[in-house]
Regions:
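N-terminal secretory signal peptides that target proteins for export/translocation
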Residues: 1-3
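Bacterial N-terminal signal peptides
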Residues: 6-17
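Hydrophobic membrane-targeting alpha-helices
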Residues: 15-20, 350
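Hydrophobic alpha-helical and helix-loop surface patches within well-folded domains
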Residues: 198, 230-496, 614, 621-622, ...
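Long, ordered, helix-rich scaffold segments
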Residues: 369, 482, 486, 495-497, ...
Length: 859
């Protein structure tokens, strides 16, 4: 037993008056352990928080506050555990029902049973707020408490199934704006300080509580009798004016759709949203006050179709959370995927009518399958529903499996039940559990009554197990006709699982593909309906963007698609084929050079903007990850010429932006790099493409990493062009990572050891991406080990997506065996207590590196 643990046990013993055994039982472990949370949820109810915070103007000064927590307690026989993971010095006083005894143990305030009563209790705490989840800046702050980070700032019951009603009072500099989940009730000003009192909220879990204060501008609008407010820090008035109506319209449409779909009115009163510069996520669904990444809302004139669709999707996603997550909340974060899958699922339904020109089946395919496969093909794949013993690991549960695989699975479930049964089941589920908590099993119970399908067994494979099936096409042709066609399913992990699903199979014919459908129910699925058809050009079992798996094509189909994919007229079939061929490249079945050549042949003929963007992405990834320098040098003139021609011929600014972005990303020849320098210097226009500040900033960074002549002066000039203080600060932060001087880059990376220098996570990630740019991979490989060593600390101190993104930024520019071996050695030598989820996300991030190193090893 460590000295710290001994002291903690002694403290609790003194408080309870019990013996050592009882004290050991009472002492809470760090984080939010499941056993502590389970006891609290069973004994505590009716929680109310009355929080007052004083926010100083000086960044170095602490926030001071008081909170009174009222609750009913059914069993006062054990000490009460509150979560407040800062330090003992932050706790100024604790008063529980008029008694002041407490201990500070492992990030918890522990109140002795002697201070508690059966029934109503009140605990008043004076404290200095912890900074870790306050996101403080010189002239603004915002809280971000998901998944269990409220305890890093405030004393709370930090678990999703102890919802509380919140009354908040904020005192701050008079020039600042502020907002909380509740509506503003009262505002008073004395000198340079203003105090704002906000209305009590509906019951909320702590991760949905949000406070903002600072130098924000406020836009207001009314739609369908409802008032909306948008807080932002954008200094470009024209950009705000260009975007504001669309932003308000998208929120209003989302609310209207969801109220009609669920038959439940919006439950949280006011509707504010805040555009945060360099926000860590796309958005966060705080009830009554959604936070967004400003760059995803306030688009430039050169925004692509994907960016406009992305804005509509993130607004719809976060609005859907008002029902799925906010109104009904998962009981424990092992079911966090439920709120995310329904938010994505609803977003897809409601965005579609706003973009009638878009092929939405293709969008669903491209938005979900590739990202989900990036995880599910790896040795570190995780199931949709995971086991979670402590909320201090909840952040590592997020990722492509819950955001992208789960919507695919949910669409399969909707098809099993039928749209009406599925919708009615969701309505019953939301009504039954409104303002409360529920589990996946609660939902399955509701849906099970609406179908003869065994949903429990279906869920065991699709939801509870990681990975995807390998599905091999088995085709025989006799006399120019299909003799047999079957599909053999295999579990690559050796568990003998069978993933029940529907295969929608394209049988390629000269007149176009014929679609047949079969149901997978066992290891071998016979497509006897195809017997007698003319010999196919190809067989694509993943057509129609429906089936999920690693589809291994027969040799003839693989050869045809690799040579003639552009001949396929149907965009959804083409999209499915591209996703399948990318899998084939990664498995060594298609040479990277042949794949790149296919992209170059396809791009001039591609008519769908979504497909163009996807093919450009595949081409760029193949270019940097799977070709060596000599191969790039040989192909660069043709590649860049094609991109410049595509840029010239693209018909809309959105299309041109996609071509220009790829050209900027891959340019290496003196001619193209020189032209980009002229564009950055504003001496050469890009006809038909209005370039914004963000475009010139990205150009400056890309040119600097190529060490063009005068790169340092170029960065200084670009810094001077940037007027917005937030964007200027980001550029200044990233600049040293672009330096041609290795020592300066080394100092920049070394500074990231200090958690204070990692607070602006998007800034850090941008710098890391340039530090490890493929053009500098040889010099950057020395930083890989240190980045891996920091991962556990990154997980403890960062927000939910940061560990995976840290790894992706570190490893994404590398393809060498040396770096792959560094990662393997790191994983081999991990201590026994290393978090399994961090090990898994390391395997996920390293998977493409491993494959690239293997594919390129003999080049």
């Amino acid at each position: 037993m460590t000295a710290m643990r001994c002291l903690a046990v002694l403290a609790v013993t003194l408080l309870t008056g019990a013996g050592a055994a009882a004290a050991q039982t009472a002492m809470p472990a760090a984080g939010v352990p499941h056993d502590v949370a389970t006891r609290r949820a069973a004994t505590i109810s009716g929680v109310r928080y009355d929080l007052s915070l004083s926010i100083p103007a000086a960044l170095a000064a602490p926030l001071t506050g008081t909170t009174t927590i009222r609750f009913a307690l059914s069993d006062p026989s054990a000490p009460l555990v509150l979560d407040f993971e800062t330090s003992r010095e932050h706790v100024k006083s604790v008063d529980a029902n008029g008694k002041s005894a407490f201990a500070y143990v492992n990030g918890h305030i522990v109140i002795p049973a002697a201070s508690l009563v059966r029934g109503d209790n009140a605990v008043r705490i004076a404290f200095n707020a912890g900074d870790a989840s306050l996101n403080r800046n010189a002239d603004f702050l915002y809280t971000l408490f998901v998944p269990a980070r409220a305890r890093l700032a405030l004393p709370v019951f930090d678990q999703p199934d102890l919802k509380g009603r919140w009354t908040v009072t904020l005192e701050h500099p008079t020039a600042w704006q502020s907002a909380a989940n509740g509506a503003e009730l009262e505002r008073t000003t004395a000198g340079t300080r203003t105090t704002v009192r906000f209305a009590e909220t509906q019951p909320l879990p702590t991760y949905l509580v949000a406070l903002i204060a600072g130098d924000f501008k406020v836009e207001t609008a009314e739609r369908n009798g409802r008032k909306f407010r948008m807080f932002h820090r954008e200094t470009d008035a024209a950009k705000v004016a260009r975007n504001r109506e669309a932003i308000f319209d998208l929120h209003a449409r989302a609310l209207d759709f969801l109220e009609r779909y669920t038959t439940i009115p919006y439950a949280f009163g006011k509707f504010d949203f805040v555009a945060i510069p360099a926000f860590q996520f796309g958005g966060m669904e705080h009830a009554g006050k959604i936070l967004y990444n400003a760059s995803g809302l306030l688009l430039d004139e050169s925004a692509t179709q994907n960016q406009m669709l992305g804005r509509a999707s993130v607004i719809s996603h976060e609005t859907a959370h008002m029902w799925f997550g906010d109104l009904v909340t998962m009981r424990w974060f092992n079911d966090v995927w439920m709120k995310e899958v329904f938010a994505n699922f609803m977003a897809a339904k409601l965005v579609n009518p706003s973009f009638p020109e878009v092929n939405h089946e293709l969008r669903f395919l491209l938005s979900n399958y590739p990202a989900a496969y990036e995880v599910d093909r790896t040795a570190g794949a995780n199931p949709i529903r995971q086991v979670l013993e402590n909320l201090n690991e909840a952040g590592s549960m997020y990722g492509a499996i819950i955001y992208q695989k789960a919507p695919v699975v949910m669409r399969h479930l909707e098809a099993l039940l039928g749209e009406d049964n599925f919708r009615d089941g969701l309505r019953e589920y939301l009504t039954r559990h409104a303002f409360a908590n529920a589990t996946w099993l609660d939902l399955i119970t509701v849906l099970d009554a609406r179908t003869p399908v065994d949903l429990q067994e279906w869920s065991r494979v699709w939801v509870d197990q990681p990975g995807r099936p390998t599905i091999q096409t088995e085709l025989t042709v006799t006399g120019g006709r299909i003799a047999t066609l079957a599909f053999r399913q295999r579990d690559p992990r050796g568990r003998n699982l069978v993933w029940p699903q529907q295969l929608r199979i394209a049988i390629g014919q000269s007149a176009g593909p014929q679609l047949i459908t079969v149901e997978v129910k066992g290891p071998v699925t016979d497509a006897s309906v195809a017997a007698g058809m003319p010999a196919p050009l190809y067989v694509l079992p993943s057509a129609a963007g429906w089936a999920y798996g690693n589809f291994r094509l027969d040799r003839g189909s693989l050869d045809y698609l690799t040579s003639s994919l552009p001949e396929i007229d149907d965009a959804l079939t083409r999209g499915s084929a591209w996703v399948t061929l990318w899998d084939a490249l990664l498995e060594g079945q298609v040479p990277p050079a042949a794949f790149l050549d296919l992209t170059l042949r396809s791009l001039p003929r591609e008519s769908d903007e979504q497909m163009t963007s996807r093919i450009l992405g595949y081409a760029s990834n193949t270019w940097w990850r799977f070709l060596n320098t000599a191969e790039r040098d040989t192909r660069a003139p043709r590649f860049e010429s094609l991109l410049r021609e595509g840029l010239a011929q693209a018909k809309t600014p959105s299309q041109k932006a996609a071509w220009f972005g790829t050209l900027r990303n891959v340019a290496t020849t003196p001619g193209t790099v020189g032209w980009l320098q002229q564009v950055w210097a504003q001496k050469e226009p890009v006809p038909g493409l209005p370039l914004a500040e963000a475009d010139f900033t990205a150009l400056a960074l890309e040119l600097a990493v190529r060490q063009v002549e005068g790169w340092s002066g170029m960065l200084q000039t670009q810094l001077g062009r940037i007027e917005n203080p937030d964007r200027k600060g980001r550029f200044q932060f990233v600049m040293p990572a672009l330096s041609a001087e290795a020592a300066e880059r080394d100092r920049w990376f070394a500074a990231l050891q200090d958690v204070g220098n990692r607070r602006r996570e998007p800034w850090v990630l941008e710098g890391l991406n340039y530090l490890h740019h493929p053009l500098r991979a040889g010099e950057a490989k020395k930083h890989v080990q240190a980045s891996l060593d920091m991962l556990w600390e990154i997980q403890k101190t960062g927000d939910i997506f940061f560990p995976k993104r840290w790894l992706d930024a570190t490893l994404g520019g590398h393809s060498s065996k040396e770096v792959a071996d560094t990662v393997r050695a790191f994983l081999k030598n991990l201590p026994p207590n290393y978090p399994e989820r961090l090990r898994n996300i390391t395997l996920q991030s390293a998977d493409e590196l491993y494959r690239a190193a293997e594919i390129t090893k003999n080049k």
